[in-house]
């Protein structure tokens, strides 16, 4: 069994670590509250905008539109946006996002040459991983989460739109974490461009709308806004998921530290009791020897 001094130092060290993890948990909880508030604030606007577009697309022959952003062409160049956090200590959050992106590439794009795939990392952990992976990495937007704003998200979305319209890429995929609650994150891979016709967001109410100006002009105005809003939603979800994952990880670490402290205190008491018992036995033995 370890000596008294060694156990005492270990208890002191674990208590110090416990204070750090508890503080990090509280900070993450505060950041999570702010992040979820931003999601709730933006969601009604994003959902309504998506509903308007879906209602238009549901009654439109996409082949009649020539907006550029809905152009489906053979995929020769692929852009994959991978969102992660900048920092660790958030459990398996970053590794699960990287696994999701690797699975996307190995399953859906297994026939692609690495030189035909560009990774756009948003978050330092994604950048650190993919710089060593052999893919071309576009590093201009790594630091979005240092100061997450709509303007920052819109800048990345505009770069993606411009690149797609210039035919630098034929398809864009986004890997991000969809926020459910502090303990649950859903790791998503979604096709971002070209814009696909989808009825999942369309209103269930049947109505015959009159559009002024015409649908093509309306979509031309709406699509860039929707694309920027959608990308910002991905970023907000990932940001909230990060803080939730870190809060849970630090809570678990704090509890584990508490359990370890209890076990160490038991070891300390046992060692102390053993030392006292040995001293008593030495004294008794010495006294008996003198009497003899």
Placement of each model-derived feature along the sequence:
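C-terminal beta-strand-loop-alpha-helix "lid" module of Rossmann-like NAD(P)-dependent dehydrogenases
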Residues: 1-292
